[in-house]
Regions:
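Beta/alpha (TIM)-barrel catalytic core signal, keyed to glycine-rich beta->alpha loops juxtaposed to Asp/Glu
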Residues: 1-169
Length: 171
């Protein structure tokens, strides 16, 4: 990094303990630690599975939020598949393994309900939920069309008031 070759390094799909251990070892060696961790994260969540290390757990989000203060190098969290590969807006899309359960279906139903109330799309509501939460998470999106990109960018202007967020969180 000192030579300007690499601005920030990151890690993906690993357990929190590995992130912490790698960052501590980097500091011991006098090099910049990982500044970013990328995990799967979205409004719906998978059923818990032993060994599932690709999900941005609350513990990971909390750890990242504790960095960047008191001399600790910051750690940003990015989320891949934040719109569940289109499943929030396309009922023909099968849910990923681990996501096909009643809570996901209820959360998708609620996304549609809230989107209707706000004049937004379910994807916009899901991304606004991710962007405006207690822990900062940066969504990584991969739209296939300009229309999809425009839709997703609309989430940046959508703010969920505390009552709506509580309603979404409670599902």
């Amino acid at each position: 990094q000192a030579e300007g070759v690499v601005g920030i390094t990151g890690i993906s799909n690993v357990a929190l303990w590995r992130v912490v251990e790698a960052r501590e070892e980097a500091l011991r060696q006098g090099v910049a630690p990982y500044g970013l961790v990328q995990q799967n994260y979205t409004y719906a969540y998978p059923t818990p599975e032993p060994g599932r290390h690709n999900w941005a757990s609350y513990e990971l989000l909390d750890y990242a939020a504790s960095t960047g203060v008191e001399g600790r190098p910051p750690l940003a969290v990015t989320a891949y598949s934040p719109i569940l590969q289109g499943a929030y807006v396309r009922r023909d899309k099968p849910l990923w393994d681990g996501f096909d359960h009643p809570t996901t279906r209820e959360r998708i139903r609620l996304l549609h309900e809230v989107a209707g109330e706000l004049g937004a799309t379910p994807n916009q509501v899901a991304l606004a939920w991710l962007l405006g939460g207690e822990h900062a998470v940066i969504p990584v999106v991969g739209p296939s069309t300009v229309e999809q990109l425009d839709d997703l960018l609309g989430a940046a202007d959508l703010e969920l008031d505390p009552e709506l967020r509580a309603r979404l969180d409670a599902a």
